[in-house]
């Protein structure tokens, strides 16, 4: 009798267990594993590919712990890379250019500041040169997420004044962005998040400043997005040294460029900025104020 009950329970429970197991597998597949589980822990990631984009710009691809992992970086946040160089701990912030939907890898686009190329910085960039010299298979430590802004979708930005503050959520219909050089990476992260959602009607305006046309990072990606989403993404460049037949602006970011290529103050947009501190301090903020954009609607990464 006991054997019969055992057999019967096995027959009854087997389909139930099968359904439960199938459900758990489907659930696990629908929620990918997150790499950056704790912002206070450093995660060593392995370099698996390096692409030369220009003489001084590289795209570095790092493997996540498994092909099923995502990085786990909220839109608007960044990571820190840390390593020891000549016995000293060096830490630098970077924003990935890959999507957080990408599984198994994370991409960083980095401008390499080589030694003896800039008279004010003869030693060059410590971290960028370290990355340049990394070999495939080498590891470096990632830590994050970090940052004071998170894009929640459909025009909603959660912004904190500092790390200890509670976030204030602002909902906008348009976003003005001013980027300089490598400051394009957090902007691209937000732009992609907006444009990949057909139900997000936020309009992004990007004013992108560089020294020369050849210095424009991620130009193919930006122009592809503009061509595919011309109603929701407006793109404008300015360069210090313009080539012949240049169709965009020349010179530092000024009041006229902001008036012509960013949303008006009347639209109550959020203005995002990322670039060299002198550009933010002397070109962006004073001219935004002249145009009428209040400081409380301006955020610097």
Swiss-Prot record:
Quote the record's binding site residues for FAD.
92-94, 109, 111, 114, 126-128, 185
Where does the UniProt entry say this protein principally localizes? endoplasmic reticulum
Membrane topology annotation:
Lipid-anchor
Which GO MF terms does the UniProt record name? cytochrome-b5 reductase activity, acting on NAD(P)H; FAD binding; nitrite reductase (NO-forming) activity
Class of enzymatic activity (EC top level): oxidoreductase
- Which Gene Ontology biological process is one annotated for this entry? nitric oxide biosynthetic process
Q: Which residues form the FAD-binding FR-type domain?
A: 40-152
Q: Which cysteines are joined by disulfide bonds?
A: none
- Biological function: Catalyzes the reduction of two molecules of cytochrome b5 using NADH as the electron donor.
What is the official name of this protein in its record? NADH-cytochrome b5 reductase 3
Name of the gene: Cyb5r3
């Amino acid at each position: 009798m006991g054997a019969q009950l055992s057999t019967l329970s096995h027959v009854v429970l087997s389909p139930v267990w099968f359904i439960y197991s199938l459900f758990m597998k489907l659930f696990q597949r629908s929620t990918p594993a997150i790499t950056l589980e704790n912002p206070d822990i450093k995660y060593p990631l392995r370099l698996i590919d390096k692409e030369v984009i220009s003489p001084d710009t590289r795209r570095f691809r790092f493997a996540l712990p498994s092909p099923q992992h995502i990085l786990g970086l909220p839109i608007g946040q960044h990571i820190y890379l840390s390593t020891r160089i000549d016995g000293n701990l060096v830490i630098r912030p970077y924003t990935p250019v890959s999507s957080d939907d990408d599984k198994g890898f994370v991409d960083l686009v980095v401008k390499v500041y080589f030694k003896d190329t800039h008279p004010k910085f003869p030693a060059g960039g410590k971290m960028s040169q370290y990355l340049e010299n990394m070999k495939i298979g080498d590891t470096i430590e990632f830590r994050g997420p970090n940052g004071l802004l998170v894009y929640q979708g459909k025009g909603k930005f959660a912004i904190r004044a500092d790390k200890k503050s509670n976030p204030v959520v602002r909902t906008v219909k348009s976003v003005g962005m001013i980027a300089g050089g490598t400051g394009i990476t957090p902007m691209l992260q937000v732009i992609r998040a907006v444009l990949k959602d057909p139900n997000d009607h936020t309009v992004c305006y990007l004013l992108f400043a560089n020294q020369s046309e050849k210095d424009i990072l991620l130009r193919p990606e930006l122009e592809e997005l503009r061509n595919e989403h011309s109603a929701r993404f407006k793109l404008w460049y300015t360069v210090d040294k313009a080539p012949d037949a240049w169709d965009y602006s020349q010179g530092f970011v000024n009041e006229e460029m902001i008036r012509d290529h960013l949303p008006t103050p009347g639209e109550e947009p959020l203005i995002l900025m990322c670039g060299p501190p002198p550009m933010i301090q002397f070109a962006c903020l004073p001219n935004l104020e002249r145009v009428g954009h209040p400081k409380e609607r301006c955020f610097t990464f």
